[in-house]
Amino acid sequence: DADLIRAAAAEAGRCAVVGGGFIGVEVAASLRALGVEVDLLMIEERVLEGPLGRALGERLTALLRDRGVRVHPRAEVTAFHGESELVSVAARGAPAIQVPVAVVGAGIAPATELAEAAGLQTDLGGIACDQAFRTSVPDVFAAGDVAAVWSPLAGRRLRVEHWAEALNQGKLAARSMLDMEAAYDRVPYFFSDVFDSSIEYVGFGGPVEDEIAVERDGGMMAYHLSGDRLTGVAKLDVDDDLQRARELLRAG
């Protein structure tokens, strides 16, 4: 898919990208680095504000614009126009974008219909599990993007849409199926690169209720809080391995 997108966008010279999350931002930055004219449409005010918070969202939105990406915030895509080929993208809150290529990275919703029909409890839009990936129905397990797994560290269920989590959870779920010791006790972590900037995050996700952003070494650290509890730490272009952040998150 990546090869096809790169080839089509490079040949066309212009591309619309729908979505202000990690997929949309990474695609927009990668295509712009290849010299493609890019329009990024998103319903949010700032890119990646959901997982990273307002401060880093503002910094990354400015970075994209500085590098030539046309960012259209609060733009809800309503239609793709064209017959045999794409001609334009229409959006509420933005002018029509004349492009021959579009990439949609607007997120997914887990398909839980079968689970619900089988009587499985759901939560956070996915299948509810305990710490050992057991669902509410005996001998049925769930892992990966669809699983809302109980985290004793967070004190709530987490549904993390990331390949590293899916890989780890699958191994633990298999151990649980075999009646071997298996307990979800991870602090989720992910990283991304946007142009030559590096992003890392460690924490439990969810809405950022409050944040403290600190300029550091030309980059930024953002500490996410819920009341007086640390729930996540995000960093942009800062040399920090986040080990201390992990320790604080584990300590609650």
Where are these regions (language model features)?
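FAD-site-proximal beta/loop scaffold in flavoenzymes
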Residues: 1-12, 84-89, 96-172
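Glycine-rich dinucleotide-binding loop and its adjacent helix/turn
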Residues: 1-34
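Short, hydrophobic alpha-helical segments
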Residues: 9, 13, 174-181, 249
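A Rossmann-like FAD-binding core segment of flavoenzymes
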Residues: 34-129
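Mid-to-C-terminal Rossmann-like scaffold of FAD/NAD(P)H-dependent oxidoreductases
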Residues: 146-241
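A short, polar/charged loop-to-alpha-helix boundary motif
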Residues: 239-252
